[in-house]
Structures are given as structure tokens and as C-alpha cells.
């Protein structure tokens, strides 16, 4: 058994592509760039026994003063624009645990779970320039990002796998997984006064711009069959893997908010509403055959 504690503090310069509003053909740089600061701490513990191997980790990480740039079409200004988001701050903390349980000589049960909180902790500043002549569209606008969840990472996960290792190199596995509390990646532009304030003239439309969409929970069921051939100093393994055995075709894999804005004209009025989130979906039932050779 052992316990390990680690901590880190670092600062790194922004990526070269994030220092320019449009690095392909425009030398205009982001105003007053600063290094991104990173602070992290982690506690790991491991317990090994004749039947059970258990390990757990507790972690916390914070990044401050991040910079992101993007080129997009601005529907409110009716022009292509270059955007810089500065002062991005994120916090991640949580716990992970995993256990391998040897049920018998040939059977192994593996369990794993994690729970965390990944969110934006600061309201960054958004500067938007026209891609045509660098004229200002919006300068140092406050984005209501504080409290939004970080997209792309489930905050609750669980996995169970049962494996059988048979004679003569045969074996099989079956696993079930769960991912919950997932959100689309939020876009800072939508939460500025120019977009959410002017476009969301009613409370309903304002909430549509600033509310973050939660993705449905996801479940997976996979299986694999493998056969190993041992030689004097090498091994050949053939595996047939089956993914998404249930054949669910509408499992959302991830998503992000759109930067586009819709114009709605009921009569003589003009209303604005955000476009729907862009989502990607997991593969349907799939089969993979792999062959590996180790020597």
C-alpha cells in the first residue's frame, strides 16, 4: 500500500495561434496578453491484496488568465469577425476510484467510478473586431461565464467489467458504462450584453442565450472475444470487439453552443434567438477486428 501527494504551480505562454486575432493574414495581436497560470494538487492511494487491488485519487486543478481566439460570422453586426476571449478561469476537482477483484483463477471483476465538478469560475472579457478592417465591434465586454459547466467531460461516471481468461489463450470481456451530468461547451460571446442583453429583449430570450444545455445521460454496453497464440519469445493476439451492443443510435457524444443568431420577425418587430446546440453522436453498433504481435 502507498499514499502519494503531489502539487504543482506553473505559468505558460499562450499558444501562438491565440495571440493573434487572425493568424493567417492579420498581424493584429491580442491586447496585453499574460501567461496562463496553473495550480494543481492530487492525492493518490493504493491498496494491494491477494483478492482485491484498490486505488483512489482526489484532485483539484485551477487555470487562470486563459486566452482563446476564434473567427466567425457575427449575425448581429452582419460581418465576419475575429474574437479574443481573455481572462478565462476554470476549476476542476473530484475523486476517482477503481478496484480489480479476482473472483477466481479465471474470472476478474473490474469496477471504476468518478465524481467531479468542472466549471468556469470567472467572467472573461470578450473583444470582437471586424475581419475586414479591424474596426471594433465590441471591446472588453463582460461575459457571464462564471458558474457555467465545462463541456466535454462527464461529471459522473461508472464502469463495470467482467473478464474470463480461459485455457489455450481464449478469453472474453463484457462491460457496461455510464456517463452523467454532461453539458454542451458554453460560448462566451452569447453571454455578453451585446448578444444576450440586446438580443434577449425578453426574459425568455435572455435565458435562451445564457442558459447552458445539459446533455442526456449515456449508457454503453460492450463485449470482446480474444485468442492469444504464444510462441517462444513472442505472442500473437486476435480480438473481436463489439461496441454499443444495444444499437442505440441517438446517444449524444458531446456538443457545443452555436455562435450564430436567428432573426425572428413577427410582424414589424425583430427578435433574436440562439441557434440550437451542435451535437455529435456516438457510433451505432460497431465491430472491430484487431491483430497485435508482441516480441
Give the ranges of each region predicted by the language model:
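C-terminal beta-signal and adjacent terminal beta-strands/loops
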Residues: 11, 178-196, 227-295
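A general secondary-structure boundary signal
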Residues: 2, 45, 120, 164-171, ...
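Gram-negative outer-membrane beta-barrel transporters
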Residues: 53, 58-62, 80-188, 292-294
